[in-house]
């Protein structure tokens, strides 16, 4: 089973045009707020092998949905 990856916005650079900032990149891990919305805590997520980035403050809904789907897959897989 493949572990989920967090998707975050690229940083804003002052020398770029605004239309180039809409791309997203793979982040270091999920934020604490995303974990709480998905019903997980930091310790449980780390035991499951999910990377946690405690420095991030943003909450992206697509990451919350990814975490919910992943936890459903784990609950269905375990006997």
Curated annotation (Swiss-Prot):
GO cellular component, one term: ribosome
Keywords, comma-separated and alphabetical: Ribonucleoprotein, Ribosomal protein
Molecular function GO terms recorded: structural constituent of ribosome
Keyword Ribosomal protein: yes
Domain of life: Archaea
Segments crossing the lipid bilayer: none
The keyword Lyase appears for this protein: no
GO BP: any one term: translation
Protein family (similarity comment): Belongs to the eukaryotic ribosomal protein eL13 family.
Protein's UniProt name: Large ribosomal subunit protein eL13
Lineage, uppermost ranks: Archaea, Thermoproteota, Thermoprotei, Sulfolobales, Sulfolobaceae
């Amino acid at each position: 089973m493949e572990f989920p990856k967090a998707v975050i916005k690229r940083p804003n650079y002052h020398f770029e045009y605004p239309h180039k900032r809409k791309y997203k990149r793979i982040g270091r891990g999920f934020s604490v707020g995303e974990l709480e919305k998905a019903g997980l805590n930091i310790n449980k997520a780390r035991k499951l092998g999910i990377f946690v980035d405690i420095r991030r403050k943003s909450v992206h809904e697509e990451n919350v949905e990814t975490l919910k789907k992943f936890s459903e897959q784990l609950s269905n897989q375990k006997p």
